[in-house]
Design a protein with these regions (language model features):
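Generic hydrophobic transmembrane alpha-helix motif, especially the helices
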Residues: 98, 108, 129-133, 142-143, ...
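Short, conserved catalytic or interaction motifs in soluble domains
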Residues: 145-146, 160, 164, 177, ...
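Transmembrane helix boundary and interhelical loop/hinge segments in multi-pass membrane proteins
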Residues: 219-229, 326-334
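Glycine-rich helix-loop "coupling/hinge" segments at transmembrane-helix boundaries
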Residues: 171-175, 188-193, 205, 221, ...
């Protein structure tokens, strides 16, 4: 038996006690207003959507991921090593050696990718150390407050007035031999494989790059310090460490991410400069800075030996800077409309 659709007209609706105007179809203006309404989204979901809408940042992120994968996989699957020599000395790009070879017959592509590993390792480790020191220092200053906060922040201001590059160079020279002597002890065999040069770079870079992180974290925590939910937790007897861990730091994650992304390119640039002047990793381990220095002698005849490491350094720093700016725009509440 077929079902027929029966529509109610105006008189029929009035008999039912309904006003026809209340159930009339929506007008074009009402439909347009309804289409503009969107369901509410959380902070992180909104930040991710804003980041994905930044096309330039997505392109740079893809390039950065590609460089990281090449740095990991090419030295693994290549038949050459970073220190292995071949009879082909100063050879141009070929199928066997896409970037050519250097004056000792070593494959430049493998050495550039291995140097990229070193640069990325320096950037990531420095970022982790900076987060550890800066977050702890800023959280203590913000929570304790008063005279202790003033003294701690004045120390940060004093450290920021010191010419960091000069001190970094001096400390790299001073710390190299003590660290090398320490690593000769069998109990430090795990760190000995990293090398005294890299460890000294980690130490000196973390020593001067945590200052901005500490100030950012302190400012974010002070902004949330007087919020009602924090005061309620204190009134209920919550410990200071619990309040900082559960309430204050989670609300400062966006600021921490923004500050951390700025540390990586700065650390990579400083490490490349130190390696360029001979204070980086020890030979024969390649670094992008040391490879650029080695290419200086033949820059007229073999300019590409200088171009390859320099281009990778510039590209990595550019990618991190663009992605960092996009993260700042996405995570900063002041940028949200």
């Amino acid at each position: 038996m077929e079902k027929t659709e029966k529509r109610l007209d105006g008189p029929a609706l009035e008999k039912l006690g309904l006003n026809p105007e209340d159930i009339a179809p929506a007008t074009a203006e009402e439909r347009a207003a309804s289409d503009q309404m969107r369901p509410s989204v959380g902070y992180w979901k909104d930040a991710m959507q804003r980041f994905r809408r930044n096309k330039l940042a997505m392109v740079m992120l893809g390039i950065l991921i590609f460089i990281i994968l090449c740095a990991i996989l090419i030295p693994v699957f290549s038949p050459y090593t970073y220190k292995g020599r071949t009879p082909d000395v100063r050879q141009g790009p070929t199928w066997a050696h896409p970037f050519g070879t250097d004056k000792l017959g070593r494959d430049i592509l493998v050495r550039v990718m291995y140097g990229t590993r070193i640069s990325l390792l320096v950037g990531v480790v420095t970022m982790l150390l900076v987060c550890l020191i800066g977050i702890s220092y800023g959280a203590i200053a913000a929570w304790v407050g008063g005279l202790c906060d003033n003294l701690m922040m004045r120390f940060v201001d004093l450290m920021m007035t010191i010419p960091s590059m000069l001190i970094i160079i001096l400390l790299s020279v001073v710390l190299r031999d003590p660290i090398k002597k320490m690593l000769s002890d069998p109990q430090w065999n795990a760190l000995a494989s990293i090398g005294s040069g890299l460890i000294s770079i980690f130490a000196v870079l973390a020593l001067f790059n945590w200052l901005g992180m500490a100030r950012s974290v302190r400012g974010a925590l002070l902004m949330n310090r007087t919020q009602e939910y924090v005061l309620a937790s204190e009134a209920m007897g919550a410990k200071a460490s619990w309040v900082v861990k559960k309430h204050l730091l989670p609300n400062a994650v966006g600021i921490i991410i923004i500050s951390a992304t700025g540390v990586v390119p700065s650390a990579i640039m400083t490490e490349s400069f130190l390696s360029f002047i001979g204070l980086g990793v020890a030979a024969p381990v390649p670094s992008l800075g040391s490879m650029a220095n080695d290419a200086l002698n033949g820059i007229i005849s073999y300019p590409m030996n200088m171009v390859y490491p320099a281009a990778i350094i510039c590209l990595i720093i550019l990618c991190f800077n663009v992605v960092g700016d996009a993260l700042r725009d996405a995570l900063d509440p002041r940028m949200r409309k």
